[in-house]
Regions:
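N-terminus-biased targeting/localization segments
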Residues: 1-71
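Core segments of small alpha/beta cavity-forming domains
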Residues: 40-121, 190-249
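Surface-exposed, charged secondary-structure patches
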Residues: 83, 88-164, 248-310
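Contiguous hydrophobic, core-forming segments of folded domains
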Residues: 138-211
Length: 310
């Protein structure tokens, strides 16, 4: 299973690569609606039935992936395949993963529905842009799941799935280019601890900030502000170090806001502002980072800095 490695991005760059993830096997299209003369795959996800494309948006979502049977026939076929495998001593989840992991059962993987849930709600139906990426979905179905498991899905949101696609489930289809699968504890442990903060104090501070970002209202990772937040949560360690510093100064995290940067021109750049309020004096300190969300893969433009209200 892939383990996340957060990187220190001291210089703004678009080339930061998660050490746990391999590169996408296909190019990413533009996120805008296309004219009739444009290529068929640019700016739109393919319809589930192979019909016309529809305007779509980028997705950078945090949640959990689960596999479901779209029909009784697929479920029965899976049961027969399970009977051919050596699954003695395994629980149902482990046996499920064993069957899916075998190359000869890849035809079953293609038949399954892979649903992404966010905060317990069914949010997206996942399909790979490249068929080779079905392996990423199999890796996300862990043999020994934990409540702290987390999946990051990066792709493009298309139309709502027809009811016959996944046993009546009608949620937007996301054609993904990359999936990271890890657990929250591994993410926190991969963050270098600030010199003046003990590991005992740092871990709870980082966990609280991460949970606050995850639990923000309606964060399905499809809006630009949520994509920027989710990107920072899993790819930029400085926000956790800064949170630990403020907590050590007896301050509370009171808000996380996003706004369009005045630096936006041809590119769409958002400012993510973190507000901390001192518990004794009620003095508010703010810091922010700029994130470019123009294309499918967000990237850091300005590292974390003090923020002053205009």
């Amino acid at each position: 299973m892939e383990q996340p490695v957060l990187e220190v991005q001291e210089q703004p760059a678009s080339t930061a690569v998660n050490a746990a993830a391999r590169p996408s096997s296909s190019a990413a299209p533009a996120a805008t609606a296309v004219s009739p003369q444009a290529c068929a795959s640019c700016g739109a996800a393919p319809a589930a039935n192979g019909g016309p494309t529809t305007p779509s948006s980028w997705v950078y979502a945090l949640g959990n992936i689960e596999a479901r049977f779209p029909s009784v026939s697929v479920e029965k076929e899976f049961a027969q395949a399970t009977g051919r495998e050596k699954t003695a001593g395994q629980n149902d989840r482990q046996a499920f993963h064993t069957v899916l992991s075998k190359p000869e059962n890849r035809y079953l993987v293609r038949q399954l529905c892979f649903v992404m849930t966010i905060e317990g709600l069914e949010t997206y139906l996942l399909r790979p842009r490249d068929p080779a990426d079905f392996s990423l979905l199999v890796e996300a179905i862990r043999p020994n799941p934990s409540p702290l498991d987390l999946d990051v899905v990066i792709g493009i949101k298309g139309p709502v799935a027809p009811p016959e696609m996944c046993n009546g489930l009608m949620v937007p289809i996301v054609v993904f280019d990359q999936i990271y699968s890890f657990d929250r504890d591994a993410l926190i442990k991969s963050i270098p601890k600030p010199e003046k903060t003990s590991a005992k104090d740092f871990a709870p501070a980082a966990e609280e900030l991460f949970d606050r970002i995850q639990q923000m209202t309606d964060n399905a990772g499809a809006m630009d502000e949520h994509r920027a937040l989710n990107y920072l949560a899993v790819r930029y360690q400085a926000i956790y170090s800064k949170a630990a510093e403020y907590f050590a100064q007896n301050s509370s995290l009171t808000s996380v806001n996003t706004q369009i940067s005045t630096l936006s021109g041809m590119r769409k750049i958002l400012e993510v502002v973190f507000s901390y309020t001192n518990r004794n004096t009620d003095v508010v300190d703010k810091c922010f980072a700029r994130v470019d969300v123009t294309d499918e893969f967000p990237f850091l433009v300005t590292k974390l800095s003090p923020y002053y209200d205009r």
